[in-house]
Design a protein with these regions (language model features):
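Core segments of small alpha/beta cavity-forming domains
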Residues: 20-94
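N-terminal post-signal-peptidase region of extra-cytosolic proteins
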Residues: 99-103, 153-158
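Short beta-strand edge/turn micro-motifs at domain boundaries
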Residues: 129, 138-149, 159-201
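Short Pro/Gly-enriched beta-strand edge/turn motifs at strand-loop
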Residues: 85-88, 150-156
């Protein structure tokens, strides 16, 4: 076989492969994509979802979205805002470490819609397993000083807490075999942040 013919055959094969559409992700793969996109700010997952669904890419950076949900729309550059942004960065790190992934699914198709219940597990802070250590005296500090100390206390807990497994399930649905599986009841990002910050009483 001449080098020119070999090159031509390789070119034909690569062109055919490029034109072959990628298979539609399974319910489990679809959940993993959405989890990586929403909870980890994964740009590759976002691009894949946009290509599959036609959903426009978000204009807000994922880190900025987390910051807005933790700190709010505060614009003043003061100690309270800086502490809030420190907490926001720690929350973003904890979100990326949740590593929510599917563990299996069950089909429950109806007449007009295909449904899959996808089970998944995540890693979340296990505050209850932590040594109580010294009593928390942040509540006794006056005014802003107590509030700032409270934020630093939460940051320290997020940094030191061991992880526990959080298991749950979501509903994925599509109309037919050619459609993409989409989540129907995935908790929003704000709810995941609240879960990470659900400190023991």
């Amino acid at each position: 076989m001449t080098p020119r013919l070999l090159f031509f055959l390789l070119w034909v094969a690569s062109t055919a492969a490029a034109q072959t559409p990628a298979p539609t992700p399974t319910p489990e793969q679809s959940f993993d994509l959405f989890a990586r996109f929403m909870l980890e700010g994964d740009a590759d997952a976002e691009a894949r979802i946009a290509a599959l669904t036609g959903m426009p890419m978000r204009t807000e950076r994922w880190e900025d979205a987390v910051d807005r949900m933790v700190v709010g729309e505060a614009s003043a550059d003061n100690a309270r805002t800086r502490a809030g942004r420190d907490l926001s960065r720690q929350v973003a790190l904890a979100l990326r470490q949740t590593h929510c992934r599917s563990t299996g699914s069950e089909r429950h198709d109806g007449e007009d819609v295909q449904v899959a219940i996808v089970a998944y597990t995540c890693q979340v802070p296990d505050y209850a397993a932590m040594d109580k250590g010294t009593p928390d005296d942040t509540a006794s500090a006056p005014g802003d000083e107590g509030e700032l100390a409270g934020v630093q206390h939460v940051i320290a807990l997020l940094q030191r807490a061991p992880w526990r497994v959080h298991a749950d399930s979501v509903v994925m649905a599509r109309l037919n075999e050619d459609d993409v599986w989409t989540t129907q009841d995935m908790p929003p990002l704000q709810q995941w942040i609240e879960l990470l910050l659900a400190l023991p009483e």
